[in-house]
Regions:
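Catalytic phosphate-handling regions of large nucleic-acid enzymes and associated NTPases
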Residues: 116, 129-131, 172
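Helix-loop-beta segment of a Rossmann-like dinucleotide-binding subdomain
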Residues: 88-92, 123-149, 208-212
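Rossmann-like flavin
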Residues: 85-125
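Short amphipathic alpha-helical patches
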Residues: 89-90, 102-106, 131-133, 224, ...
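Residues forming the flavin
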Residues: 1-80, 120, 141-252
């Protein structure tokens, strides 16, 4: 049976179908997926899926803060710190975009409700973390990730053009003639659905759950990366995996 995805007053899927059409399919609902959904045109129908519940995202677990360009005078040092930390293998254009856009992103996060530590004058307070040569890290206590992601999630849930399906797994992406046409998903009730989408975004997190010891949620098993490799999608820097020192141990 084929039918379009029906969006209700509160952004819920109102009919069960075996195939559906949406404008944008976002796999994953961490910071990346949520921020994308909030920045897409409101006339686009968006389907978001997440493998577990929406709050079981590693974005919620991030404790440290996020770096931000305080002023233009800090740009060169910020750029050099980032390149050095990446052994100068970074994509320079991506680093530039990350730095230049950081202030606007922070403004968006604050507008979404995120609260960051302030100094005695009410201005953002900055601290310093690894690889940074100066204080440029904003934070919320020791739960910055939770503070940011929870507010982004709240704002997304308010959008009538977004359907968020929890406990829904992407089984594979759908391709034809080297073009991605959507994905096959399995919903919480076990239904297998072919989702046709004009754009498919894989924002499903990393592979930490595959390791014996990890600070990641166990369900983060690299499904999106595996699907991309299967369909010959170009993968970059997949040899870089951050191992947190607190988990780098064995019984022997």
């Amino acid at each position: 049976m084929k039918a379009d995805l029906v969006y209700g007053k509160h952004g819920r899927m109102e009919n069960k179908v075996k195939s559906m059409k949406t404008d944008v399919l976002i796999v994953g609902c961490g910071c990346s997926g949520l921020y994308l959904a909030l920045n897409l045109p409101r006339d686009k129908k968006i389907l978001m899926i997440t493998k577990s519940d929406a709050k079981s995202s590693d974005s919620f677990l991030a404790q440290g803060g996020m770096c931000m360009l305080k002023d233009d005078a800090d740009y060169d040092n910020y750029f050099e710190d980032t390149m050095k930390a990446g052994h100068y293998e970074n994509d320079k254009k991506s680093v530039e975009i990350m730095i230049r856009s950081s202030r606007d992103v922070v403004k968006d996060l604050i507008a979404a409700g995120a609260d960051f530590k302030k100094d005695e004058n009410g201005n953002l307070a900055y601290t310093r973390e690894g690889a940074h040569s100066s204080n440029r890290i904003i934070f919320h206590e020791d739960v910055t990730g939770k503070e940011i992601t929870s507010h982004l999630l709240d704002r997304v849930r308010e959008l009538p053009n977004v359907v968020l399906l929890e406990n829904t797994r992407m089984l594979d992406i759908i391709t034809r003639d080297n073009e991605c046409l959507g994905a096959v998903i399995r919903t919480e009730d076990g239904s297998i659905i072919n989702v046709s989408a004009d754009a498919t975004v894989l924002a499903a997190g990393g592979i930490g759950g595959l390791y014996r010891h990890s600070t990641n949620f166990r369900h983060l098993t690299g499904d999106a990366v595996a699907a991309a490799i299967k369909h010959n999608v170009a993968i970059k820097d997949n040899n870089y995996v951050q191992i947190h020192p607190t988990t780098f141990y064995s019984k022997n």
